[in-house]
Amino acid sequence: MSENQEWLKPYAVFCALAEIFQTTEHWLWGHLAKCDDKLIEKLTDPETSPIYSEGVHFVYYLQWRLHMQLKEASTYLKQFGIALKGDLPIGVDKRSVDVWRKPELFRFYTKYGRTSRCVR
């Protein structure tokens, strides 16, 4: 876990809160709408977190199972000269853990592609 805690802890908290609030629209989460290191540490502490046992810990488990399954599949496919490839998104959804965690890193008013002044 220690090598993945930078992304796994915020992700687990985000998933747990999204389940509690029944939405990923984090700006609707009241005082939990703003994420910081203290909040993440508080909500991932197994001794004191009100969401740890049913939410955060479950996400840790799911991510571990996914890791093990992908590792096994990758090892199996490697025997046949097949490699698994991932995909990197160009854009980020404003309802994502990345935006909740570090909103200052994203601009949502950028336009891509042809502008309205371009006419064929």
Where is each model-derived feature located?
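Active-site-proximal, well-structured secondary-structure segments within enzyme catalytic domains
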Residues: 1-81, 88-120
